């Protein structure tokens, strides 16, 4: 006689909404929280209507970001009544409670465990007795150094890899050390295993991020850790060399111009990592840099010249602040002169505004808003001209382009028009390449790396046609069929 077993009743998983605001470093924190939610059996709701509670990962750096975060918290409260606030603004709970006293819980940044404790309290989950959960992290690993496959908030073909948290600088306009603490680096082995897993899953481009990437490992006294049976030092040079051996595009962000960065540029000249440096210069006037409490006054041009001698293909991006307190017309002219001489490839700028709790708020010499805007316009006029001239030099060349999206017109065969980026363009902040697929229409997929002939350019973008679709072969065994192109 055969006994049939009645099916066990299923329990619907609690649904949690999620809002991620701020920079790529905050995005990585969001990915870690979402990974833990999934690992513990929670479902991520696509909208407020389906959510039983909402997590808001906030930004608290500049005033507009604070206001955006507070507005998002309010919307989530109106929709669900249960909101957990985390991230940078969470380091200032009084700011949140003043506007939204009914939030369920507040944590700071890098607080996955705290966030999950509050989620469990708000939405207790009944685990299936026949299903076990493996830990996302192992004993001795830093929070966020995951073993399990993680949730990504970027397309499959690129990812942000955060190598350190916090900052040791005391820039007068910045409150990051107050929000995120002093620098805490991850062991090199943890970073490399994460990169290895990402590439094995089909990721072709890694953006290496932190507040001060050049200082990676200083707090660890550059100790070694294990990666595939080898001891690797927690130093940017060693890390970059190992990452470069994996065969993906490796892009360096937030690189301060310390002397050892020349070794990184040498790796770029050898083709091991992308010839791209995101360098936060902020200004060129020694007087303004001193008031900002920033390094590099008087040495920036010499450093850039040396880098370009080592790697002529190097693309340099930087960001500047215009209208800092005490900035004279002479100071601003020094900045314009620097821009003309340095001929940076990618430039961003914004006008100075007070940041709550920043030391710069107490500086005298506030610049009128109309003067700030006038200087910003002059700055961007120079920057756009230089960008237009530098991009025009690429016309006629064949460049590698990673495809981010389709851009088909109505009536086009699918995959006829593509948008991608060169090795000199990071997603979201730099230029794009608009391509006609030609004979390769319908064959190129998002995430493919193609070769394209550049036919035209403007201030920020390039235009061209696909001429070849080589197969992508990293030095990491791929999971599944991710190797085509």
Swiss-Prot record:
Residues annotated for [4Fe-4S] cluster 2 binding in this entry: 167, 171, 174
Ranges for domain Radical SAM core: 153-389
Keywords on record: 4Fe-4S, Cytoplasm, Iron, Iron-sulfur, Metal-binding, S-adenosyl-L-methionine, Transferase
GO function terms (MF aspect): 4 iron, 4 sulfur cluster binding; aspartic acid methylthiotransferase activity; metal ion binding; protein methylthiotransferase activity
Free-text comment on the cofactor: Binds 2 [4Fe-4S] clusters. One cluster is coordinated with 3 cysteines and an exchangeable S-adenosyl-L-methionine.
SUPFAM superfamilies linked to this entry: Radical SAM enzymes
Domain TRAM, residue spans: 392-468
Leading EC class: transferase
E.C. number: 2.8.4.4
UniProt protein name: Ribosomal protein uS12 methylthiotransferase RimO
Species, as recorded: Deinococcus geothermalis (strain DSM 11300 / CIP 105573 / AG-3a)
